[in-house]
C-alpha cells in the first residue's frame, strides 16, 4: 500500500507507543486521525508537529470503553476525511495485578479497553476499510502469547486480541488484511527501575531492550509490504519467546 495521502486512524495515539506509531505514519504523508482519551496534550502536540511539517492531522477524543463510542469513532473519521484506509488499534491499559489481587473494576477496565474496544472499533470501521481495500493492525503483546502472572488481566486481554485478529482476518477478507504486532520490551512500563530494565535485557537473546522504532518497522512492513499477509501475529521481541 502506498501510504502518502491515505487516511489512518491510530487509537491511543497521544502517548507512548501509540504516539510513536502515529508519528511515523504522519511522517510518511498519511492523513492522520489521532485518537485520545486521557492524553489530549500529547495528541495535540503530535497533531501540531505534523501540521507544522506540512501534513494533515486531526485529534478525536473518545472513551473507547464505551462500545458505542468505539464503534462511532471510525465513522467520525470518515465523516471528517471521506474515507478510512488504515486502522491501528493501539489504545490499551496495563496494570501490575496478579490473579488474586485483580478486582472486578480492574478486570473490567482492562478487558473493556484492551479487547472489547478493538472489537467494536473494528466493527465501526469495517465498511470503510472494505471500500478502501484497507488494512487493520492490532497491537497485541508478548503477554498474549505467554502467561504473565503478574499482569493477569492484561495477559488475558492480549490473548483475546490475538484470536480476535484471526477472526477479523476471516471476516474482512478478501478486501481487508488484519494482522497484529506483539512487541516485547520496546517500551517498558514507566514504573520499571534500572534493575528491572536490566533483567529484561538479560532475559532477551539479543541481550538488549528494543525501542519504539522496532514496533514502527513492523507496522510499516505490514502496511507497505505485507499485502499477502493476513491473520498473523508479528512478534518483535528480540527472541524472548525462544527462552
Where are these regions (language model features)?
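C-terminal substrate-recognition "lid" of short-chain dehydrogenase/reductases
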Residues: 128, 212-236, 241
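Short, small/polar-rich loop/turn modules that mediate ligand/substrate recognition or access, typified
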Residues: 173-177, 229-231
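Alpha-helical segment proximal to the catalytic Tyr-Lys
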Residues: 127, 169-174
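Conserved glycine-rich cofactor-binding loop
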Residues: 7, 14-15
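Substrate-binding pocket helix/loop in short-chain dehydrogenase/reductase
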Residues: 98-99, 106-111, 200
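Active-site helix of classical SDR
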Residues: 122, 157, 165
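Conserved glycine-rich Rossmann-like NAD(P)H-binding loop of the short-chain dehydrogenase/reductase
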Residues: 30-45
Amino acid at each position: 500500500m502506498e501510504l502518502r495521502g491515505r487516511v489512518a486512524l491510530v487509537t491511543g495515539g497521544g502517548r507512548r507507543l501509540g504516539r510513536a506509531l502515529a508519528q511515523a505514519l504522519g511522517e510518511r504523508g498519511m492523513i492522520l486521525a489521532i485518537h485520545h482519551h486521557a492524553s489530549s496534550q500529547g495528541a495535540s502536540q503530535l497533531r501540531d508537529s505534523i501540521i507544522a511539517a506540512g501534513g494533515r492531522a486531526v485529534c478525536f477524543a473518545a472513551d473507547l470503553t464505551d462500545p458505542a463510542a468505539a464503534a462511532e469513532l471510525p465513522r467520525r473519521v470518515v465523516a471528517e476525511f471521506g474515507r478510512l484506509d488504515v486502522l491501528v488499534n493501539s489504545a490499551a491499559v496495563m496494570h501490575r495485578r496478579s490473579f488474586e489481587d485483580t478486582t472486578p473494576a480492574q478486570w473490567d477496565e482492562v478487558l473493556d479497553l484492551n479487547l472489547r474496544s478493538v472489537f467494536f472499533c473494528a466493527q465501526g470501521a469495517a465498511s470503510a476499510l472494505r471500500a478502501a481495500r484497507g488494512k487493520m493492525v492490532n497491537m497485541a503483546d508478548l503477554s498474549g502469547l505467554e502467561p504473565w502472572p503478574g499482569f493477569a488481566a492484561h495477559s488475558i486481554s492480549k490473548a483475546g486480541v490475538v484470536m480476535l485478529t484471526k477472526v477479523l482476518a476471516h471476516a474482512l477478507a478478501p478486501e481487508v488484511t488484519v494482522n497484529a504486532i506483539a512487541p516485547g520490551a520496546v517500551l517498558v512500563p514507566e514504573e520499571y527501575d534500572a534493575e528491572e530494565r536490566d533483567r529484561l535485557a538479560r532475559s532477551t537473546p539479543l541481550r538488549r531492550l528494543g525501542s519504539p522504532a522496532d514496533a514502527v518497522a513492523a507496522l510499516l512492513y505490514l502496511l507497505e509490504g505485507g499485502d499477502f499477509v493476513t491473520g498473523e501475529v508479528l512478534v518483535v521481541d528480540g527472541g524472548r519467546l525462544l527462552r
